[in-house]
């Protein structure tokens, strides 16, 4: 128990595999669940004062945490998940579930968020990665975000300053952490929005191995190619290392089929990169983030 942070939900030596989509990850020294910005500021101020590292994990949907875990503080925004509407502007805290947020937009007959209706993760992670699917991406509707700097300052970043690119945003370099974001939506027809979301979710269910733990799409799309196609052409569908294998359903996904570890994921990613490059001459670049310490 850290007496200076009394009243905040903090768990010591907590295995992170219970909180990641891959179901892998070693322990965090301290796993914190702030309920508001004040508690978040207290955690960051304490960590900075004690020279302890800290990071925000988000919903960990496109992330692999190594088996040795993470030192210092890991902060999760599960309790910072409010969503508000002001006219056609939707504002969501970073911990808000992305899929649930798209449902709120649909309920109010607001269009623009349909592309994200099946993307797992949080609002904060979606902004960080400029998440996208089926021709849409966060940058198309993004207005601004409140972020927490490494020094503990809260500031607002505009769409221009976010410098979005393919699965990229400026905060990947600055280290700023999204705590809330605003999006510009448009009035639409509820039935039309609902039908489009149903169509996209049906496509996702047909093509993606949603029944297994995974980190989503593992690799960025190489120019002029599709990662899944290159992996399939290299005869890697079903290839397995430890408990992790390349999905038979979609070669761009790696699934945890038998108590796999983060090392299994890393070894399989490295093997796929090398094999695909030898086969096609194209070097795949991971989209998934890998953090933490090895055992």
UniProtKB/Swiss-Prot annotation:
This is UDP-N-acetylenolpyruvoylglucosamine reductase. The keyword Oxidoreductase applies. It is an enzyme of class 1 (oxidoreductase). Belongs to the MurB family. Its cofactor is FAD. It is found in: Cytoplasm. Its EC number is 1.3.1.98. One of its GO terms (biological process) is regulation of cell shape. The gene is murB. PROSITE patterns: FAD_PCMH. The keyword NADP applies. Cell wall formation. GO terms for cellular component: cytosol. The active site is at residues 167, 217, 287. Pathway: Cell wall biogenesis; peptidoglycan biosynthesis. It catalyses: UDP-N-acetyl-alpha-D-muramate + NADP(+) = UDP-N-acetyl-3-O-(1-carboxyvinyl)-alpha-D-glucosamine + NADPH + H(+). One of its GO terms (molecular function) is UDP-N-acetylmuramate dehydrogenase activity. Its main location: cytoplasm. Residues 23-188 form the FAD-binding PCMH-type domain.
């Amino acid at each position: 128990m850290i007496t200076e942070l009394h009243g905040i939900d903090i768990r010591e030596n907590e295995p992170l595999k219970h909180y990641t989509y891959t179901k892998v990850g070693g322990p965090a020294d301290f796993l914190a669940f702030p309920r508001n910005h004040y508690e978040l500021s207290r955690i960051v101020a304490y960590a900075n004062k004690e020279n302890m590292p800290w990071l925000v994990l988000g919903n960990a949907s496109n992330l692999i945490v190594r088996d040795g875990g993470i030192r210092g503080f890991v902060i999760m925004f599960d309790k910072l998940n409010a969503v508000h509407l002001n006219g056609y502007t939707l504002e969501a805290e970073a911990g808000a579930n992305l899929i649930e947020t798209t449902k709120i937009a649909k309920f109010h007959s607001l269009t623009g968020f349909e592309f994200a209706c099946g993307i797992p993760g949080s609002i904060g992670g979606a902004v960080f990665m400029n998440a996208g699917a089926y021709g849409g991406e966060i940058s198309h509707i993004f207005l601004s975000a409140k972020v927490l700097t490494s020094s503990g300052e809260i500031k607002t970043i505009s769409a221009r300053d976010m410098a979005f690119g393919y699965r990229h945003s400026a905060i990947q370099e600055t280290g700023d952490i999204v705590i809330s974001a605003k999006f510009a939506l448009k009035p639409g027809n509820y039935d039309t929005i609902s039908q489009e979301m149903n169509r996209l979710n049906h496509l996702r269910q047909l093509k993606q191995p949603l029944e297994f733990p995974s980190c989503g799409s593992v690799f960025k799309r190489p120019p002029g190619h599709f990662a899944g196609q290159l992996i399939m052409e290299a005869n890697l569908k079903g290839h397995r290392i430890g408990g992790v294998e390349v999905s038979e359903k979609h070669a761009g996904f790696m699934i945890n089929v038998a108590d796999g570890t983060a090392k299994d994921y890393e070894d399989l990613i490295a093997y796929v990169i090398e094999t695909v490059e030898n086969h096609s001459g194209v070097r795949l670049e991971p989209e998934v983030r890998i953090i933490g310490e090895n055992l």
